[in-house]
């Protein structure tokens, strides 16, 4: 799709909307084409990262607000690496945040950062972003130890896993920001990678730090969906 460039995140978010709207137009048209021509009523998992997660959130808003749309086949929306605010939920009152490992039709979201971080491009200061802890699949603020981390996986540009580290880090949800704070990561070892992020913003690692937990969870939610809906193929 015609992805908005990194420059779109260096200006006010409202000013960036025309560029993001172009990106979303492509994503929505592609999704509609798939649903109308290939889906055949099978359950769907939506997943995105960063701008892609913003696109997934927009899709979820549209189809939960549209009568007769595809909400009945949505297993879950993984909005990883983008904020989900109360304003977002108010715009689409049928949307809900995930609260466990198996609830369906819900949004799974988190933004990973060091405990010292107080603001980022993704979650600005004084903004609360709803999250779930991928180590416990709970929305409370209790710290979860690294032994609950099934494995961080790091990949090359082809997507191939080049390194896996079991029990990589623990994490907790920040009660003020709603972000996911990691407890066992050295910012010097995992730099932000982009100039728009300060040290300790682990945006680029959101999926990687919790890879195996996320992988397992997709299966859990699909199984839950199929059980509730009395069987069916997965697409």
Spans of features found by a protein language model:
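Gly/Ala-rich beta-loop-alpha elbow adjacent to hydrolase catalytic centers
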Residues: 47-56
